Regions:
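OB-fold and OB-like single-stranded nucleic-acid-recognition modules
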Residues: 2-8, 21-197
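Bacterial N-terminal signal peptides
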Residues: 12-20
Length: 197
């Protein structure tokens, strides 16, 4: 009987050993270090947009058309790279999306011309106008969208914030280059270059 018990224990031990060896070895990977194990880097939209910024500005500036000529001609029907100069009539802070209202030199139309200056910016004008990268440059829509948002943050940090815009800009001359989007009553520009004198 003791021999049978020992044999039974030996068989159970062997079965247990076989069962556990089928599980393999599990490696616990610390959070944030996945790339060192998989070789796949996590997408960093902030770093990507910051690294691309100067090239994006040059790209859009090269494509920019005179806004007055466009508006006095056939108008704007899609997002367009533009440049222009005008007098600041108003600094609107009534909504979280602050903007300058600009009277363009030579513009004969009735649409209000706005240059974004602050607040949340959901525009995709900069992302859509630059030709460094396109949707296929990214893994998915989330990365493409995130890249666009980070380009807007670069515009705010690199172009708008250094100007410290306040009510004192009213009456001054603004020169801009950026992406224009036309609505029913207004043309709104997200600037990649902006000077106020």
């Amino acid at each position: 009987m003791i021999m049978k018990s020992r044999r039974l224990l030996a068989v159970l031990a062997a079965c247990t050993a076989v069962t556990f060896t089928g599980c393999g070895v599990v490696t616990v990977v610390p959070i944030g270090e996945e790339a060192s194990y998989t070789g796949k880097q996590e997408f960093d939209s902030a770093a990507e947009s910051e690294g691309d910024w100067s090239s994006v500005v040059a790209d859009i500036s090269q494509k920019a058309q005179d806004l007055v000529e466009l508006l006095n001609g056939d108008g704007i029907t899609e997002t367009t790279a533009v440049k222009g100069t005008g007098k600041i009539k108003e600094y609107n802070t009534d909504t979280p999306k602050h903007y300058l209202v600009v009277e363009l030199d030579g513009f004969t139309g009735t649409k209000e011309i706005r240059v974004r200056t602050d607040g949340p910016n959901s525009s995709t004008a900069i992302r859509d106008l630059q030709s460094l990268k396109n949707f296929e440059s990214f893994t998915n829509q989330t990365e493409w969208s995130s890249y666009g948002k980070e380009l807007n943050k670069q515009a705010l940090a690199q172009v708008i914030d250094p100007l410290e815009i306040d009510e004192s800009v009213v009456g001054k001359t603004v020169t801009f280059t950026g992406g224009a989007e036309a609505g029913a009553d207004a043309v709104t520009i997200t600037a990649v270059e902006l000077t106020i004198e």
